[in-house]
Amino acid sequence: MPSDFASQSNSSQRVIASAAYPENRRGGVDLKRAFDLLLAMLLLPLVLPIIIVLWAMIRVSAGRHGTGFFSHARVGRRGVMFDCLKLRTMVPEADLGLPAILAHDPAARAEWERDVKLRNDPRVTRLGRVLRKTSLDELPQIFNVLAGDMSFVGPRPVPKDELERYGRAKYAYLSVRPGITGAWQVSGRNDVDYNARIAMDVEYARRRSFARDLGILARTPRVLLRRSGF
């Protein structure tokens, strides 16, 4: 449904990158990628109906001018840009309203400059708050996994301008595929400050293993349920 996507850039862009971290391969086979494909194919029949229902709810609540999906350019492995997919949680043209919010609210501006996000973002819709709290807005990223842009486990995907804040830590980020879940998501998420999150991404890239990925995947549902209040 191409016309239903709100997109902010072209996925054909690239950035210069040098990833000095080894890949997880055994006998020429990318085991992590093979596992991602297998898990995505198993989950897709379960996830797709949920995505369709949520997409319909977003379209109904937004009216004819709203879009159900949102895509934004993120930096992938080796610096390749890709369109990261989400269910839309903000009002239409939300980015156009951000400068006014930051200009009139010094506290919000300070929070944005520190964390590159707002904990209580006024642009998020009522339904969007529920989707974010439960992380259901990220379900469409299963298609990013199938396309090879993302993995189930890895660093949080970030835009190009935000990656510049990583300094030399960006090479750790660029050595792996971004993930739907990861060390940051299961270690406090909103309670973890920005620099600590970057440190987690570096540590994951250096010590990544199949066993660790399985551990993060196993912890993710429990963390989501606890954060959602169930």
Language-model-detected regions and their locations in the chain:
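A hydrophobic, helix-centered structural microdomain
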Residues: 23-96, 216-230
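Short, glycine-rich, amphipathic interfacial segments at transmembrane boundaries or analogous
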Residues: 5-6, 68-122, 181-199
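Residue-level signal for short amphipathic helical patches enriched in basic/charged
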Residues: 45-48, 134-137, 153, 189, ...
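An acidic site on a long C-lobe helix of protein kinase domains
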Residues: 30-33, 46-49, 123, 135-138, ...
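N-terminal hydrophobic signal-anchor/signal peptide
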Residues: 1-47, 110-113, 171, 204-208, ...
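Cytosol-/stroma-facing membrane-proximal "stalk/adaptor" domains immediately downstream
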Residues: 155-216, 220, 224-230
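A short, structured surface patch at a secondary-structure boundary
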Residues: 111-176, 216, 220, 224
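Flexible glycine/proline-enriched surface loops and loop-helix/loop-strand junctions
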Residues: 35-38, 122-124, 198-201
